[in-house]
Structure formats: C-alpha cells, structure tokens
UniProtKB/Swiss-Prot annotation:
GO molecular function: asparaginyl-tRNA synthase (glutamine-hydrolyzing) activity; ATP binding; glutaminyl-tRNA synthase (glutamine-hydrolyzing) activity
Protein name according to UniProt: Aspartyl/glutamyl-tRNA(Asn/Gln) amidotransferase subunit C
Catalysed reactions, as listed in the record: L-glutamyl-tRNA(Gln) + L-glutamine + ATP + H2O = L-glutaminyl-tRNA(Gln) + L-glutamate + ADP + phosphate + H(+); L-aspartyl-tRNA(Asn) + L-glutamine + ATP + H2O = L-asparaginyl-tRNA(Asn) + L-glutamate + ADP + phosphate + 2 H(+)
Pfam families in the cross-refs: GatC (PF02686)
Organism of provenance: Pelodictyon phaeoclathratiforme (strain DSM 5477 / BU-1)
Family: Belongs to the GatC family.
EC number: 6.3.5.-
C-alpha cells in the first residue's frame, strides 16, 4: 500500500490542515515510511507466541473504592480563587 499526495491532501482537508508543497511531499514520504514499517510488523512470525493484553503481571493496580462523606459547599469554596455567593467565579471563556 502506498500513500499519494492526493491521499495526503484528502486527509489534510479532513483534519482542516494546510500544507505547503514541500510539506505535502514530506508528509507523503513520512506516511509511506510508517506504512512500510507496519507492513514489516505484519511479516513477523508470531507462531506460538501467546497474545498479551499487558506486559506485566500486575493484576489490579487500582485502589479500593471506599465511600467517604462528601465535602460541604463551604469547604469546597475555600479552595476557590474567586467566588460569588455559593459558586466558583471563573473568567468568561466564550465571547
């Protein structure tokens, strides 16, 4: 499988990216190198190798889910850099 500049142009349009002609050639080359590497991985003999979902033997690395009393609104608002009544006050982010 090979990637053409037409393919890269299509992908760039989907991603809303714009490339110069030099960048387009570079991206085409780099994508072809990646695909070539993946093709090499497909050639690896994995006969007799067990499939793995993880590389280590850890069974459960999560802590126990223990229920605690929730913080009061007052305690939570003590962490607020700025507040108004019972609410966090944050800078406007939408014009």
């Amino acid at each position: 499988m090979s990637v053409t500049t037409k393919d890269v142009t299509y992908i760039a349009e989907l991603a809303k990216l714009k490339f110069s002609d030099d960048e387009m050639l570079t991206m085409t080359s780099e994508l072809n190198n990646i695909l070539h590497y993946v093709e090499k991985l497909n050639e690896v003999d994995t006969e007799g190798v067990l499939p793995l979902s993880t590389i280590h033997d850890a069974v459960n690395v999560l802590r126990e889910d223990v229920e605690h009393q929730p913080l009061s609104s007052t305690a939570v608002l003590l962490n607020a850099p700025d507040r108004q009544d019972r609410f966090f006050k944050v800078p406007k982010v939408i014009g």
